[in-house]
Curated annotation (Swiss-Prot):
Naturally occurring in which organism (per UniProt): Vibrio vulnificus (strain YJ016)
Positions that bind Zn(2+): H76, H80
Keyword Nucleotide-binding included in the entry's annotation: no
Gene Ontology molecular function terms on file: zinc ion binding
GO BP: any one term: response to stress
UniProt protein name: Protein SprT
UniProt-listed InterPro entries: SprT-like_domain (IPR006640), SprT_Zn_ribbon (IPR035240), Uncharacterised_SprT (IPR023483)
Family per record: Belongs to the SprT family.
Domain spans labelled SprT-like: 17-161
GO cellular component: a single term: cytoplasm
Active site (record annotation): E77
Keywords: Cytoplasm, Metal-binding, Zinc
Length: 168
């Protein structure tokens, strides 16, 4: 387990088991229990690894949004795994996934979360051209530093220059 308290992990496992139990009853089928991991970074709340039957949760967002994770994010990701196991490769938030969210879990088929992401935002760096300033992510900033990429303003077509300022 990565950076997650035992009690929170226990609650996540309980929610996961409840989702699989609901699906087993609904479809009259025995679905394998997914593996739960907390190795997701960035702004994503959760991610389903279909062929591994694994769900990865963002531990920082989970700690900040416990109830929403237990009631919405975990069922959302379980629905992806169930969709894959029942229908194979289909659109990630297509009709099959929506029917599982609404029919099995009785939840709205929301495709994105509305969590505050400031705590997982990552570093940004200020770049400028002739007409304005741009925040670049650490990934893009590092590519510029290694001469692997350069970025151009769409408006004035000038190459962006690092100002020396780290924004966050």
């Amino acid at each position: 387990m990565k950076k997650i308290e035992f009690e929170l992990h226990y609650q996540a496992q309980k929610a996961l088991h409840a989702c699989i139990d609901k699906a087993n009853r609904y479809f009259q089928h025995q679905f394998p229990m997914p593996l739960l991991s907390y190795q997701l970074r960035g702004k994503a709340a959760g991610k389903a690894y279909l062929q591994l039957n694994q769900i990865r949760l963002n531990p920082i967002l989970f700690k900040e949004n416990k109830t929403a994770f237990l009631e919405e994010v975990i069922p959302h990701e379980v629905a992806h795994l169930l969709t894959y196991q029942l229908y194979g490769r289909v659109k990630p938030h297509g009709a099959e996934w929506q029917s599982i969210m609404q029919g099995v879990f009785l939840l709205p088929a929301n495709t994105t979360h509305q969590f505050a992401v400031a705590s997982v935002q990552g570093k940004t760096f200020q770049y400028r051209c002739q007409c304005r300033e741009f925040p670049l992510t650490i990934r893009r900033h590092n590519k510029v530093l290694r001469n692997e990429a350069s970025y151009t303003c769409q408006k004035c077509r000038q190459t962006l220059i690092f100002t020396g300022i780290q924004l966050s």
